[in-house]
Curated annotation (Swiss-Prot):
Its EC number is 1.8.1.4. It holds the Pfam family Pyr_redox_2. It catalyses: N(6)-[(R)-dihydrolipoyl]-L-lysyl-[protein] + NAD(+) = N(6)-[(R)-lipoyl]-L-lysyl-[protein] + NADH + H(+). PROSITE patterns: PYRIDINE_REDOX_1 (PS00076). NAD(+) binds at G180, S181, G182, A183, I184, E203, A269, I270, G271, V272. Keywords: Cytoplasm, Disulfide bond, FAD, Flavoprotein, NAD, Oxidoreductase, Redox-active center. The gene is lpd. This is Dihydrolipoyl dehydrogenase. The active site is a redox-active disulfide bond. One of its GO terms (biological process) is 2-oxoglutarate metabolic process. The active site is at H445. PANTHER family: DIHYDROLIPOYL DEHYDROGENASE, DISULFIDE OXIDOREDUCTASE.
């Protein structure tokens, strides 16, 4: 006999659990099916524990440079086991918090593996080995994604790692190859370099952080090289052969020449693959687009009553995108008024390396490609009072405006705490704010955020402090 709900959510990551909570707030009877961890990859083996590791690296770096602030007799050392243990404690604490939130909102959590047997029915094999049939008016698929693997290369966790292995290393690698330079690759490169590993990054694209503005990418590359991180762009990994002592990498450089080099470890960070297998998509004829479930701006699939959100529904594969998509889908299912479709141009992206990177909207290059007559503002942190006081003068803020309408097309930041500031520009884009309105906004002094204001002023020849 089937258990009946208004909504079934398959997957308890940042998209799934948020969708479940929002639907429950709207008085829907909700079941959430999760096979492993509430909180998903982000909370357990992604965003959150990574930030804990990077915070340890940041503190270690600051201790090494304490004399610059008048502090003496510092000889810092680190305990990798304790660094890892702290990151796991943080993840466990937050996962417990998600469980509490779901219980508070009266969401029924079912531990097990779910498979759609109809557009309003799901078969669940629970972790206890039971089979349950669930029925609902609507189903949201939020099964997430997993690390993309290299062809014919197995990430065994010994010498070849995915992000999962890199979050819990048995020892600090001596010589590390990072394959891929998106946010994940860059963050791990930064972390391991801070603790003394010899790091090389190989990237097929002409620049690291390929999705970021070219000026930002170039700045990060320069900063990384200054830290001793080697960067090989326009290069391709031809082969990766593990043995008992490490790995041998064959890398084709920009000139086409293939070289062999030994590394103690390699991290594969070349993107993700959607978890679309074995959940019943074929039976229902649910369409895919380049391996991801095809959806509209509200998360609807081509099959009535079946929705998809988060990484399984395509790029950008970001936790905050998944959560917002979850809210949109839940409100659309509940019949709320004034539900707005997802605008992917207003989703900020953040990379928490040293230096940090944050952006929203169009890069200068993309804006020009789309035919905009652009105005560019650029303001360096070295001209910002708070940055000088903090000893954090690296980086800049770049803004891209439509010269004809004054619309903010994009914002791109590199430097200290920019991941905490990008939301200001995201709000501006969401509200369709013009350059005049931002210029008329009062920014507090002294703050790093004043550089955001000055960048806008600079776009119109009005910068006051540079």
């Amino acid at each position: 006999m089937a258990d009946h709900f208004d909504l079934i959510v398959l997957g308890g990551g940042p998209g799934g659990y948020v969708a479940a909570i929002r639907a429950a707030q709207l008085n829907l009877k909700v079941a959430l099916v999760e096979r492993v961890h509430l909180g998903g990859i982000c909370l357990n083996w992604g965003c959150i524990p990574t930030k804990s590791l990077l915070r340890s690296a940041e503190v270690y770096h600051e201790m090494q440079n304490a004399e610059a602030y008048g502090l003496t007799s510092f000889k810092p050392d680190f305990d990798l086991d304790k660094i890892i243990a702290r990151s796991r404690e943080v993840a466990t604490r937050l996962a417990s918090g998600v469980k509490t939130l779901l219980r508070k909102n009266k969401v029924e959590v079912i531990s097990g593996v779910g498979q759609l047997t109809g557009n309003q029915q799901m078969l669940v094999e629970t972790t206890e080995g039971e089979e349950k049939i669930l029925e609902a008016k609507d189903i949201i698929i939020a099964t997430g994604a997993r690390a993309r693997q290299l062809p014919n290369v197995h990430s065994d966790g010994k010498h070849i790692w995915t992000y999962h292995h890199a979050l819990k290393p048995p020892a600090m690698p001596k010589k590390l190859l990072v394959i891929g330079s998106g946010a994940i690759g860059i963050e791990f490169a930064s972390f391991y370099a801070d603790f003394g590993a010899e790091v090389s990054i190989v990237e097929h694209a002409p620049q690291i952080l390929p999705m970021e503005d070219a000026e930002v990418s170039a700045y990060v590359a320069k900063a990384f090289k200054k830290r001793g991180i080697r960067i090989l762009t326009q290069s391709a990994l031809q082969n990766l052969t593990p043995d008992d002592e490490g790995v041998t990498a064959e890398i084709a450089g920009a000139d086409g020449k293939v070289t062999k080099e030994r590394f103690s470890h390699a991290i594969v960070a070349i993107g993700v693959v959607a978890n679309v297998e074995n959940i019943g998509l074929d039976k229902l004829g649910i369409k895919l687009d380049r391996g991801f479930i095809a959806v509209d701006g509200f998360g609807r699939t081509n099959v009535d009553h079946v929705w998809a959100i988060g990484d399984v529904a395509g790029a950008p594969c970001l936790a905050h995108k998944a959560s917002h998509q979850g809210v949109i889908a839940a409100e659309a299912i509940a019949g709320c008024d004034h539900v707005h479709p997802l605008n992917t141009q207003n989703i900020p992206g953040c990379t928490y390396a040293r230096p940090q990177v944050a952006s929203v909207g169009l890069t200068e290059e993309k804006a020009r490609q789309q035919g905009y007559n652009v105005k560019i503002g650029n303001f360096p942190f070295i001209a910002n009072g708070k940055a000088i006081a903090q000893g954090a003068t690296d980086g800049f803020v770049k803004t891209v405006f439509d010269a004809d309408s004054g619309a903010l097309l994009g914002a791109h930041m590199v430097g200290a705490e920019v991941t905490e500031m990008i939301q200001g520009y995201t709000v501006a884009r969401t509200l369709e704010t013009t350059e005049a309105e931002i210029m008329e906004t009062i920014f507090p002094h002294p703050t790093l955020s004043e550089a955001m204001h000055e960048s806008v002023l600079a776009a119109y020849g009005r910068a006051l402090h540079f």
